A protein has these predicted regions:
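Trp/Phe/Arg-rich N-terminal binding region typifying the photolyase-homology
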Residues: 1-159, 250
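Glycine/tryptophan-enriched, flexible segments
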Residues: 121, 147-262
């Protein structure tokens, strides 16, 4: 059994986290981390509310790990420098994470894979951000769909319990690295960003009633009918599988919204 890092990115939660589940199940010790990536942050305006949103949820995630007797190490800088140095200094054997499909992320992860491989450190990715990756729902001729309706039909036909599996981590939490280590958690101001919240962020909870009546309420501005969960799905504070399980039984319109995102 090895000593591993779990690198949180677009998955700011512990519950139903595929990559974290994989790391905990296959490692004797797992240290969760988050990196505020300067290659991304340096391109953003200083009052970008997405950064504040992420910062707040990283704080919540850190507190959640501390309640479990562990901690989330939070870094600020270039992942290409931080991860090789961290694995060497702390003698980690592998790094686990959930796959990110943005062009920058794909290039970054390929470089990190090569850097870690040169140091005999394994780099593992898991599917967590989507139900189906782009090569999993294709036309009969093997080509990708360009029209939503036939794509959604194929998507629904393929959906089963395997793709909606809940990655419960509770039985493996004993493998989290224990103790709180002093890794300096910089303030937003130290990173050059404003901590002034310009508007209330959507809540990271939904209800069966909201999903069930989503298509009836969403077009009425005076009614709180939209789920407002897109930002939470984007940064993984809630599980796409959990929402799909609810929508599958309660509201096809809401499920179609998730398919459109996929």
């Amino acid at each position: 059994m090895n000593k591993s890092i779990f690198w949180h990115r677009r998955d700011l939660r512990i519950h139903d986290n595929a990559g974290l589940h994989k790391a905990l199940k296959s490692s004797s010790t797992v240290q969760p981390i988050f990196i505020f990536d300067r290659n991304i942050l340096d391109l953003l305006p200083r009052n970008d509310q997405r950064v504040l949103f992420i910062y707040q949820y990283v704080q919540k995630l850190k507190e959640a790990y501390q309640k479990l007797g562990s901690d989330l190490w939070v870094f600020y800088g270039n992942p290409l420098e931080i991860l090789p140095k961290l694995t060497e200094e702390k003698e980690f054997d592998s790094v686990f994470t959930n796959r990110d499909y943005e062009p920058y992320a794909l290039e970054r992860d390929k470089t990190i894979f090569d850097l870690l491989k040169s140091k005999n450190v394994e780099f593992h990715g898991a599917k967590d951000h989507v139900i189906f990756e782009k090569n999993e729902v294709l036309k009969d001729d093997g080509k990708p769909y360009t029209v939503f309706t036939p794509y959604s039909r194929k998507w629904k036909a393929k959906l089963n319990d395997y793709y909606l599996f809940t990655y419960s981590v509770e039985k493996y939490l004993g493998n989290l690295n224990k103790g709180i280590e002093e890794v300096k958690f910089l303030s937003l101001q130290k990173m050059g960003f404003s901590d002034v919240q310009l508007f209330p962020f959507p809540k990271d909870v939904t209800s069966d009633d909201l999903i069930k009546n989503y298509d009836l309420r969403r077009n009425f501005p005076s009614v709180e009918g939209t789920s407002r969960l897109s930002v939470h799905l984007r940064f993984g504070t809630i599980s796409i599988r959990e929402l799909a399980r609810q929508a599958q039984h309660l509201n096809e319109t809401f499920l179609n919204e998730l398919i459109w995102r996929d």
